[in-house]
């Protein structure tokens, strides 16, 4: 089904169904059935945007707004909604909603050039935000590193909106041929040698890329893993790479993994490091070798797809130091989207916790990572020693669930229950952009009893607030063993080998 048509039907369905039920519960967070105990002012983005859409749809002064976000090679994404006509007394309401929508699109889909049709006021306001001294200067500069272009806002007529051009990157779960799968993490690197779907070799090697400024350390480490795999293969037909960081056209544009490398060395040796290492294999075997480099979140979703063995869409979110995301379509394809869910606004509460790096509020990282646990724990009155690392603060809260002290145990249970409420109201928001039937939840935040409480509360919220979505989406927590073993093997399935 055409994506634009799907969204129109989706919004219409929700709008009509609310009136059939005689309920206004979806037209604003004031009527939410569930509120986080330690964050009662939480305003889910999905409900707030839906309330805006509903209010506008009842106005005689409504008009259609079309947003097109373009990235490299002309790939783009279209978003259509209703807004109030310019100058009808609702310009601030328009701006607040559309400013949030644009921020969401930047971090979900990715891109640098906005085409906006349907308003003259909004492009001008947004242009003020996305400049070197504007409110969104962080995004303005960040996306220059990602797409090698600053964020640009173009006002245009509807007929001037570029034609929809979606990217489809096929991924294979059959693993035919002789393949290398490589997974680059912050504390170890994993490699697998796979022949026609059978894993012949897997090795996990400790490394510390975040602490080394010499590009040769990283190059040597990658080649060491490649060469280990080659010893167990007669030839190499394809290489798939899973890496932390932002990947565009197989290049690693921004990555904390290589954060110590100088800007000059990064540009010369790191941005194309994986492609350059595969070129060395091509010289070794005197042949062209297909290669696909993907964000580790997308590969996590692919690993889930292989484990579930179903032709259905999968969204994966990893909850650790931050939040990571990955998506595989029901046709087993990557989309080329950014999927940086850590910086996607999911709470429209104007007093939501501020992220000091991006200078924005209400972003996913503060709701689905160890930072969320710490935030809620402090609000609940939990005391932490000053020298505790964030990871150890998380561990302290997780240990409280096992405590014999009933008060401590209840506080910890409420923290993970509150996070489950966050997720229950955010899944419909994710469904607005991603077509998925399975949500994989990973990471140390959801290990142990806390993770079970988190998932069960999210399911409860879905069932009672969004029953149609509850029927469609299943939530899974893969076990640690299958996740660790599967990541590099799944990466091996990235390139299409013919």
Where do the PLM segments sit?
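Classical Sec-dependent N-terminal signal peptides that target proteins to the secretory pathway
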Residues: 1-24
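Long, compositionally biased, glycine/small-hydrophobic-enriched stretches that function as flexible linkers
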Residues: 25-161
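Glycine/GP-enriched mid-protein hinge/lid loop-to-helix segment characteristic of carbohydrate kinases
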Residues: 25-79, 93, 125, 165-172, ...
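Glycine-rich phosphate-binding loop and adjoining helix at the ATP-binding site
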Residues: 87-98, 105-109, 120-157, 206-220, ...
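Short, well-ordered amphipathic alpha-helical segments that serve as non-catalytic structural scaffolds
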Residues: 100, 216-232, 277, 422, ...
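Short glycine-rich phosphate-binding loop at a beta-alpha junction
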Residues: 108-120, 235-244, 434-445
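Short glycine-aspartate micro-motif
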Residues: 113-115, 177-183, 236-240, 292, ...
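Phosphate/ATP-binding catalytic cores across multiple sugar-kinase/actin-like superfamilies
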Residues: 418-436, 494
């Amino acid at each position: 089904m055409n994506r634009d048509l799907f969204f129109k039907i989706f919004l219409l369905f929700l709008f009509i169904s609310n009136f059939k039920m005689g309920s206004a519960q979806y037209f604003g967070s004031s009527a939410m059935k569930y509120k986080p105990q330690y964050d009662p002012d939480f305003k889910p983005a999905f409900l707030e945007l839906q309330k805006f859409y509903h209010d506008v749809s009842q106005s005689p002064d409504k008009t259609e707004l079309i947003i097109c976000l373009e990235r490299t090679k002309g790939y783009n994404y279209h978003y259509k909604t209703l807004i109030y006509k310019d100058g009808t007394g609702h310009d601030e309401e328009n701006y607040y909603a559309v400013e949030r929508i644009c921020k969401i699109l930047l971090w979900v889909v990715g891109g640098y050039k906005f085409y906006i049709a349907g308003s003259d006021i909004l492009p001008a306001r947004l242009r003020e935000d996305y400049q070197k001294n504007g409110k969104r200067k962080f995004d303005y500069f960040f996306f220059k590193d990602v797409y090698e272009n600053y964020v640009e806002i173009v006002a245009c007529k509807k007929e001037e909106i570029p034609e929809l051009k979606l990217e489809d990157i096929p991924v294979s779960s059959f693993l035919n041929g002789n393949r290398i799968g490589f997974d680059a993490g912050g504390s170890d690197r994993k490699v697998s040698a796979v022949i026609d779907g059978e894993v012949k070799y897997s090795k996990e090697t400790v490394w510390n890329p975040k602490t080394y400024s010499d590009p040769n350390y990283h190059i040597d480490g990658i080649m060491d893993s490649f060469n280990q795999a080659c010893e167990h293969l007669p030839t190499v037909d394809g290489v798939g790479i899973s890496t932390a960081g932002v990947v565009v056209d197989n290049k690693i544009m921004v990555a904390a993994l290589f954060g110590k490398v100088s800007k000059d060395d990064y540009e010369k040796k790191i941005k194309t490091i994986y492609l350059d290492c595969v070129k060395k294999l091509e010289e070794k075997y005197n042949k062209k070798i297909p290669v696909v480099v993907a964000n580790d979140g997308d590969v996590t979703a692919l690993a889930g797809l292989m484990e579930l063995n179903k032709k259905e869409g999968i969204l994966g979110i990893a909850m650790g130091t931050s939040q990571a995301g990955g998506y595989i379509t029901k046709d087993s394809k990557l989309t080329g989207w950014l999927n940086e869910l850590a910086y996607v606004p999911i709470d429209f509460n104007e007093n939501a916790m501020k992220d000091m790096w991006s200078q924005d509020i209400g972003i996913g990282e503060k709701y689905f990572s160890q930072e969320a646990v710490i935030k809620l724990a402090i609000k609940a009155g939990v005391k932490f020693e000053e020298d505790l690392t964030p990871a150890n603060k998380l561990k302290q809260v997780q240990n409280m669930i096992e405590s014999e002290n009933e008060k401590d145990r209840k506080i910890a249970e409420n923290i993970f229950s509150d996070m489950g409420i966050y997720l229950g109201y955010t899944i419909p928001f994710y469904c607005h952009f991603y077509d998925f039937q399975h949500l994989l939840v990973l990471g140390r935040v959801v290990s142990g009893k806390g993770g079970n409480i988190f998932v069960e509360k999210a399911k409860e919220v879905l069932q009672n607030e969004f029953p149609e979505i509850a029927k469609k989406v299943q939530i899974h927590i893969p076990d640690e063993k299958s996740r660790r073993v599967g990541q590099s093997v799944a990466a091996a399935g990235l390139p299409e080998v013919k």
